[in-house]
Amino acid sequence: MDNVVDRQVFYISDGTAITAEVLGHAVMSQFPVSINSITLPFVENESRARAVKEQIDAIYQQTGVRPLVFYSIVLPEVREIILQSQGFCQDIVQALVAPLQEELRLDPSPVAHRTHGLNPANLNKYDARIAAIDYTLAHDDGISMRNLDQAQVILLGVSRCGKTPTSLYLAMQFGIRAANYPFIADDMDNLNLPAALRPFQHKLFGLTINPERLAAIREERRENSRYASMRQCRMEVAEVEALYRKHQIRYINSTNYSVEEIATKILDIMGLNRRMY
């Protein structure tokens, strides 16, 4: 891309900085900018804030270009120190809170760590998410075929098409109990839907991938192997897609999608509730 510029970006918060990172990344993705990012969570006191200010100012002195600072900080005295820095500072939460305050006719009651912190109000949700993660890990890659009735979705696909990272993302981000089952090379001579999965066909969701991309991924894992050959990858993808069509299993091609996009498409297509934590 022409005219791409480099900028230093800070994501700063008195909590985990997850919100600052997510919103900051979303904003920066709109511009042809190559960024070097620094995330600084738990900036909760003036001493820590002054150290952060010095870090921002040092980069400005070195480069002559103002760092971009996306922050979410509750305490005014801590926030003020960051604002005194040589960075271009944007309060990512306040930009949304102010118009909502007017619309709701309510004053906000900001509390540090509220978004991603653990407190009595969200303890049950937290426990449910941990249970989903435990379930997903126990049912990764066909390790266990027990308790599939408890799964909310069962992902299918050839080896290295994205089943495991997608399952874990669904569990960690949305509290979804996601099992996944691999179709391996030995299955291809007589590929069929395993008997253990047939009672749960309504929960099945398939992933496929372009053979060229699959071969490149597998080559990194097992160089110059039959497993990574184009012939093998083409055959496996064709067989698995035929299986999906035969059993009317919904599926998507994961080649050009991130894990986040794959997970979101699965939630939408399967009609699963998004539970944010």
Swiss-Prot record:
InterPro entries: Kinase-pyrophosphorylase, PSRP, TF_DNA-bd_sf
Catalytic reaction annotation: [pyruvate, water dikinase] + ADP = [pyruvate, water dikinase]-phosphate + AMP + H(+); [pyruvate, water dikinase]-phosphate + phosphate + H(+) = [pyruvate, water dikinase] + diphosphate
List of residues binding ADP: 157-164
Gene Ontology BP terms: regulation of DNA-templated transcription
Keywords: Kinase, Nucleotide-binding, Serine/threonine-protein kinase, Transferase
Keyword Glycosyltransferase attributed: no
EC number: 2.7.11.33, 2.7.4.28
Gene Ontology molecular-function annotations: ADP binding; ATP binding; DNA binding; phosphotransferase activity, phosphate group as acceptor; protein serine/threonine kinase activity
Superkingdom to which the source organism belongs: Bacteria
Annotated function: Bifunctional serine/threonine kinase and phosphorylase involved in the regulation of the phosphoenolpyruvate synthase (PEPS) by catalyzing its phosphorylation/dephosphorylation.
PANTHER family registered for this protein in UniProt: PYRUVATE, PHOSPHATE DIKINASE REGULATORY PROTEIN 1, CHLOROPLASTIC (PTHR31756:SF3)
Family: Belongs to the pyruvate, phosphate/water dikinase regulatory protein family. PSRP subfamily.
Protein name, entry field: Putative phosphoenolpyruvate synthase regulatory protein
Organism: Cronobacter sakazakii (strain ATCC BAA-894) (Enterobacter sakazakii)
